[in-house]
Design a protein with these regions (language model features):
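Active-site metal-coordination/substrate-binding segment of hydrolases
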Residues: 80-148
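Glycine/Thr-rich phosphate-binding loops of Rossmann-like dinucleotide-binding domains
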Residues: 91-93, 157, 172
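Short acidic, glycine/proline-rich loop/turn micro-motifs
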Residues: 34-37, 116, 158
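Hydrophobic alpha-helical segments, chiefly the membrane-spanning helices
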Residues: 172-178
Length: 178
């Protein structure tokens, strides 16, 4: 029953999901020189700001860790599931054949653009999973925390700033690391 309900929910929100992903792909969030308040450069900070906008649009309270990373909690429980994803991308370089790397394109049912698989697409999938659970009213006994970093491609130093001490989550992984 819930599986079918979730499938229907995702199908009904597919166009929103695609637009949210496109909004992230358009940001060339390659690591750049630090600026005041933007430790990994302006594009990385812009990607985090877009992540905040998306999460807040769906009713999640978001903590911004000084533009190193952001985190959204499903509820106020202390321990639970941590989902880690990132909004930075490796430099575009050569080899793109379908589209400009930062202009999203859907062709034959597939989306092309920098970050669709690593890791903006999985980040959007995680946001929509949390949104579906919330909007469908599924009760959770523990918290789910989504942490979106901005420096994974260059060492993940962004995650050092997400909490004064490491959380005791039951599982921490990136959605793209299945």
């Amino acid at each position: 029953m819930r599986k079918e309900e979730l499938r229907t929910y995702i199908e009904n929100h597919e166009s929103e999901m695609i637009e949210d992903l496109k909004s992230l792909i358009r940001i060339p969030s390659e690591k750049q020189a630090a600026e005041p308040g933007k430790p990994f450069g302006a594009p990385a900070a812009e990607a985090l700001a877009q992540g905040i906008e998306i999460l807040e649009k769906y009713g999640f309270a978001v903590t911004n860790y000084d533009n190193y990373a952001i985190a959204a909690d499903f509820n106020q429980e202390e321990k639970g599931l941590d989902i880690l994803a990132h909004l930075d991308v490796v430099p575009a370089g050569e080899g793109w054949q379908e589209t400009d790397p930062f202009i999203p394109l859907i062709k034959e049912g597939k989306m092309f653009g920098r970050g669709t698989a690593d890791d903006k697409g999985p980040a959007i999938a995680a946001i929509y999973a949390m949104r579906a659970v919330k909007e469908l009213g599924y009760p959770l006994k523990k918290n789910v925390r989504l942490v979106l970093g901005s420096d994974e491609e260059c060492g993940s130093s962004c995650l050092l700033y997400t909490s004064p001490s490491p959380r005791d989550g039951l599982l921490s992984r990136m959605p793209s690391s299945a």
